[in-house]
Amino acid sequence: MSAEERLIELEIRVAEQEKTIDELSSVLTEQWKTVDQLSKKLNALTNRFLELEEQAAPDVPVTKPPHW
């Protein structure tokens, strides 16, 4: 294999790797958006649950665990 053929092969590999990196970056961005949306929904549901729990048993104090 000549030096020129090796150079061409390396350029092809670099181009393929750049494409893969771009695709993975796009997927990762979408996943972070999904995680953020799910986190917001979970927080809203947690708050709603605590409200309903307080309404169901108003004499029993509801306290969030320290990690909330």
UniProtKB/Swiss-Prot annotation:
Organism listed in the record: Brucella canis (strain ATCC 23365 / NCTC 10854 / RM-666)
Family per similarity comment: Belongs to the SlyX family.
Name by which UniProt lists this protein: Protein SlyX homolog
Coiled-coil residue windows: none
HAMAP family: SlyX
